[in-house]
Amino acid sequence: MIDIPIIRASEVYLTRAEANYNLKNYDDALSDLNLVKERRYSDYEEGSESGAALEKEIQLQRRLELAFEGHRFFDLKRRHEDVQRDGKGFMADGSGVPSSTQHVSADSPYYVMPIPQSEIDANKNMVQNKY
């Protein structure tokens, strides 16, 4: 028996909302978004977002609902968006002083994770990602 959540209903609804938005099924996307917000907020009134505002609200609710669960990096990568951080992270210019901002473009090789050596050993045709 596994006693940790693997995937929550809100993640499923938000993923479906994003998929429906991308398929231009805006009414279905809004319906899924409203389901999540209705469960989360006691004083919630049904939303009527549309267009870019709907997409932005889906992304915001996904970020809020799934905070600290390790989804953000993969959400940005899936949407081909850059990573923009303040200077409080681990990247530095070699002086030991963090940069004021840390930016990784969506096309950067730093956006790709290395393939585990055990996987490369298991498949000799596999080539390591450039990073």
What residue spans do the PLM features occupy?
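Acidic/polar-rich alpha-helix caps and helix-coil junctions
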Residues: 1-131
